[in-house]
């Protein structure tokens, strides 16, 4: 089930948060930058993990779901785009995002979590994806794993 909420993703009551990241080791804008600033440990582990795979076998990163535990949250870095840019191209790979989300939801079941918060238009604003496609992936996987997905939008943004 998907529920839409207006509010700050980083202060959401859900223990788990997921967001899309690129495979370049950069959290330079959007929600990724906000998470980097709020949770330095998440960025440190993402950077180390990305750099390791960039050096050894970069093909392993797309579709990966990295979980980082902080003091009060578990953050899932979803490797759904290989590159990034600001030129209007689509950098989000729906296939890689779906694989990462599938792994994320599977890991949630293993640790006993049933709710997750994600940003509205994940993979769409910065990644250039189509929200209807991403939303469809979320709906299918939330039903498959019986996970409640809370989609957060800051006040002033359109949210269903």
Regions found by a protein language model. Give the residues of each.
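Macrodomain-like recognition of ADP-ribose-binding/processing modules
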Residues: 1-160
């Amino acid at each position: 089930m998907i529920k839409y909420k207006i509010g700050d993703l980083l202060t959401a009551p859900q223990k788990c948060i997921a967001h899309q990241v690129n495979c370049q080791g950069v959290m330079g804008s959007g929600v990724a930058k906000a998470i980097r600033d709020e949770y330095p440990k998440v960025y440190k582990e993402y950077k180390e993990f990305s750099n390791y795979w960039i050096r050894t076998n970069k093909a392993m990163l797309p579709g990966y779901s990295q979980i980082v535990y902080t003091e009060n949250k578990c953050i899932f870095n979803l490797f759904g785009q290989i590159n990034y840019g600001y030129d209007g191209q689509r950098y989000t790979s729906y296939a890689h995002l779906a694989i990462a989300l599938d792994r994320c939801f599977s890991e949630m079941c293993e640790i006993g979590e049933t709710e997750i918060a994600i940003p509205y238009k994940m993979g769409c604003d910065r990644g250039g994806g189509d929200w209807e496609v991403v939303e469809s992936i979320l709906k299918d996987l939330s039903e498959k794993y019986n996970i409640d997905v809370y989609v957060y939008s800051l006040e002033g943004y359109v949210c269903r």
